[in-house]
Amino acid sequence: MANAFPSAVWLLFASAMIISAIGFIKYVWFISLGYGFSIAGLGFLMLYLFKDSLSCGTILLCLLFVAYGFRLGGYLLFREVKSAAYNAKMKTEIKDGKTMPFGVKCAIWVTCALLYMTQVIPVFYRLHNGAGTDTWAYIGAGVMAFGLIFESIADWQKSKAKKINPKRFCDTGLFKIVRCPNYLGEMIFWTGVLISGANVLTGAGQWIMALVGYIGIIYVMFSGARRL
């Protein structure tokens, strides 16, 4: 299990903790803004930590994390600031967290940071294990890029539809094909991440960490889709 927890992995966890701490301002930000910007931050951090051993494929994988995180974080931030309909809905559906015990907030914070760390761990292990770039890395990156584009189009189509009728569930574009294409895009993206590191994970510890992150985010996506 030792090779699953090199010292650098704790830097990932600490970074996710620092960035997602924005949730103490508004607790839902632990899983929204804190999520998106944590993934972007972890992508940047891996580029820095392994700057002397990067290859084309590993740079691409890290940059996809950055693109994913900034796109998601930026989209959510814009919605928070500009969408009156969204803010009105959130006031009725989600509590502001002011009465939530501090200990509960801390538990959510730590759990989220751990999840975000394990989500990117397949790429981290590829870098840590010195595996460089191979076919698996490029296939994984391709799947990630497809998921990112798919999710981006879905969010754009939903925003466009909500401007016309804020109260109507979006059923145009990709939403004609699948009920929650934005969530599907998320799942495709993280499947690509797992694929990118599947052939370089060594030992039970690395596999457990990678599967915890993958299963965790897939569970979150299915849970979110069921609530709609």
Language-model features: locations:
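Hydrophobic transmembrane alpha-helices
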Residues: 3-16, 20, 38-70, 119-157, ...
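C-terminal ends of transmembrane helices
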Residues: 16-27, 73-79
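Hydrophobic alpha-helical segments of membrane proteins, primarily the transmembrane helices
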Residues: 26-29, 33, 62, 106, ...
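Juxtamembrane helix-capping/reentrant segments at transmembrane boundaries
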Residues: 30-40, 85-107, 168-175
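Select subsegments of transmembrane alpha-helices in polytopic membrane proteins
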Residues: 31-33, 102-115, 179-186
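A basic- and aromatic-enriched beta-loop-alpha substructure that forms the phosphate/nucleotide-
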Residues: 57-99
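A general boundary/transition motif marking the beginning of the first structured unit of a protein
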Residues: 78-82, 106, 220, 224
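PAPS-dependent sulfotransferase catalytic domain
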Residues: 88-131, 137-141
